[in-house]
Amino acid sequence: MSSYKLFCMGNPLLDLQVRDGEKLLEKYGLKSNDAILAEEKHLLLYDEIVKEHEVTYVAGGAAQNAARGAAYCLPPKSVVYTGCVGDDDLAEQLKAANKREGLDEAYLVKKGEKTGACAVIITGHDRSLVTTLRAAEKFEQSHLSSEAVAPLVDAVQFYYMEGYFVTHGLASALELAGKSAAKSKCFVLNFSAPFIPQFFMPAIQQLLPYVDIVIANESEAEAWASASGHPAPTDLAAVAKSLAMQPKTNPARPRVVIFTHGAEETVVVNSAEPGRVRTFKVDKLAEGEIVDTNGAGDAFAGGFLGALVAGRELDDSVEAGHKLAKISIQQIGPQFKWPKVQIL
């Protein structure tokens, strides 16, 4: 019998972090503080980084970051993650990074494909992110019903998915979310980036009836509000209410909407009490304590999920999210402190 409580799905990427990357920025025409998908002119960048620079490998990909965060908070064998990787050295690096955090993976491995990667080029306090999805967008729905994965899907009580996954894997997302709703389990969706509700709104709206908890930041909330024709897209409280009250397949389980807003208060609305908007203060860091905010949203989701899976109340789960995000912001990339800090 599986002991896993949380099943996460997304695009597995290995972050390749290099410092003093001014020459790389110049050579590949990159901005110092940016995040883009790789174009053809960037494709040699990854090999060059590995061969000619001192690389720090960090397991990346939004849902994988959140899954590692949840695993950091929970006992071993609590969290399992799936996504598609290639049969290459990057996948092995990814497995090693996950093992450090206590995250187990059930990858679909595509022979002859390259694992997705994100080049993180650091210059001073700036970070230029260049992502190539590669194998990540080759995920197959049949993997969810495979002999290795189906028992994991059935055993857990919680599911988590990044919004990025709907760009190529909507059928898989709907299968997982549908199973969750049918058994009155908890399905959590993170919007992940403003372009997801902006350009993939039909996919989001198709998935939403099965979603029990939505996590988004203020920009993603505004993008969803604009795409859905909301009259006041920057009014986080009003948007949270509207999102909470969208149609739901399993009305027995109320929908919770959580909007983070950087160092500002986190907004929470529960469809069981749509008139009540709750806010949670963020314990702000001094400017000098902030090392890297990349992955802070994923760390929040990880801490929140860890507490939720451990049976904590919603309030405590939001606070656990804040706590893990604060730790992550003081590290390079989406990483956590060792020896472990007690989150729960």
From Swiss-Prot:
Pathway membership: Purine metabolism; AMP biosynthesis via salvage pathway; AMP from adenosine: step 1/1
GO molecular function, one term: ATP binding
PROSITE patterns: PFKB_KINASES_2
UniProt-annotated catalytic positions: D298
Pfam families listed in its UniProt record: PfkB
This protein's record includes keyword ATP-binding: yes
Swiss-Prot/TrEMBL catalytic activity: adenosine + ATP = AMP + ADP + H(+)
Presence of keyword Lipid metabolism: no
Assigned keywords, A-Z: ATP-binding, Kinase, Magnesium, Nucleotide-binding, Purine salvage, Transferase
Catalytic activity, EC: 2.7.1.20
A biological process from GO: purine nucleobase metabolic process
Gene Ontology CC annotation, any one: cytosol
InterPro entries given in the database record: Adenokinase, Carboh/pur_kinase_PfkB_CS, PfkB_dom, Ribokinase-like
Similarity field: Belongs to the carbohydrate kinase PfkB family.
Protein's name in the database: Adenosine kinase
Species, as recorded: Schizophyllum commune (Split gill fungus)
